[in-house]
């Protein structure tokens, strides 16, 4: 709440008009905002889409906020987990697994790939897994959750191991960290013909979409989905719109980080990606 109020104050201080409601593009340069009081049409030569993304649910067990959580629920938990299942071992999954393990929960991580933090170098994955297991965490790679049932007492999961064996285990809570879904529904992309790739808005190096005057930044665009990338895209788009000295972002130079113990950070190609690109490593 304090953070929200701080941002609201900054918007007011800088004389930025804020319209609360649901926005929908109706034409290039035109936006309709629907609120309880009615609809307001806004026009501008440049419009930036920054609607972000939301956590992807398991198709057979959507998050309920009580026993099955997304990262949003895990940030402000209604109760401290005693035995926690984390599905997915990307940055979000590992960060929460590490945090709750440090807080005393018994943590199990299930990852369908053959190693955790799969976007990192293989050596990093191996080192991190060894460290987390040493801290008491259970990590299952090459595994998947076949079913997930939640009730007032906890969560029951059927987990398929690497060798194909399915076992059932009970947990107090579950965090689902299997990716994100862009918030692009109902904002008028189809009407304007704005191009998307797997649901995410396609942009060039200056954050421009294929429709002149329409820009997009942050998690609603292509990966990596990182806060520092999103904020820098805001700078890029603003500079380009202002006509100053715009600069394109090279996605190969975006650092990634995972806030766990031990911490993980990387930039550039992994050894495997470098070899795939034909480099002599």
Model-predicted regions and their roles:
Residues 1-4, 8, 75-76, 81-85, ...:
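Rossmann-like dinucleotide-binding cores of NAD(P)H-dependent redox enzymes
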Residues 17-30, 56, 141-154:
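A conserved short coil-to-beta-strand element within the FAD-binding core of flavoproteins
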Residues 27-58, 69, 76:
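Glycine-rich active-site/cofactor-binding loop and its immediate structural neighborhood
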Residues 51-106, 110, 135-138, 190-192, ...:
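Glycine-rich dinucleotide-binding loop and its adjacent helix/turn
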Residues 65-80, 168-245:
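FAD-site-proximal beta/loop scaffold in flavoenzymes
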Residues 275-281:
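Cytosolic Rossmann-like ligand/nucleotide-binding regulatory domains
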């Amino acid at each position: 709440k304090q953070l929200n109020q701080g941002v609201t104050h900054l918007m007011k201080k800088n004389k930025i008009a804020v319209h609360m409601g649901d926005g929908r593009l109706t034409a290039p340069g035109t936006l309709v905002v629907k609120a309880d009081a009615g609809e307001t049409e806004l026009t501008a030569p440049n419009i930036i889409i920054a609607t972000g993304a939301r956590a992807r649910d398991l198709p057979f067990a959507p998050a309920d906020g009580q026993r099955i959580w997304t990262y949003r629920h895990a940030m402000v938990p209604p109760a401290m987990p005693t035995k926690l299942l984390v599905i997915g071992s990307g940055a979000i999954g590992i960060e929460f697994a590490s945090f709750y393990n440090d807080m005393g929960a018994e943590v199990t991580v299930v990852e369908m790939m053959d190693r955790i933090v799969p976007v990192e170098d293989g050596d990093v994955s191996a080192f991190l897994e060894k460290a987390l297991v040493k801290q008491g965490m259970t990590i299952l790679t090459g595994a998947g959750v076949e079913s997930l049932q939640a009730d007032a007492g906890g969560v029951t999961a059927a987990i398929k191991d690497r060798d194909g064996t399915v076992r059932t285990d009970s947990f107090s809570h579950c965090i689902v960290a299997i990716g994100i879904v862009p918030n692009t529904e109902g904002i008028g992309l189809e009407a304007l013909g704005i191009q998307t790739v797997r649901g995410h808005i396609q942009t060039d190096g200056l954050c421009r979409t294929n429709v002149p005057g329409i820009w997009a930044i942050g998690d609603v665009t292509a990966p990596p989905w990182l806060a520092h990338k999103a904020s820098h895209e805001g700078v890029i788009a603003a500079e380009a719109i202002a006509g100053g000295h715009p600069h394109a972002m090279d996605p190969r130079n975006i650092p990634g980080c995972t806030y766990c113990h031990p911490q993980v950070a990387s930039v550039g190609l992994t050894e495997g990606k470098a070899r795939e690109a034909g480099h002599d490593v």
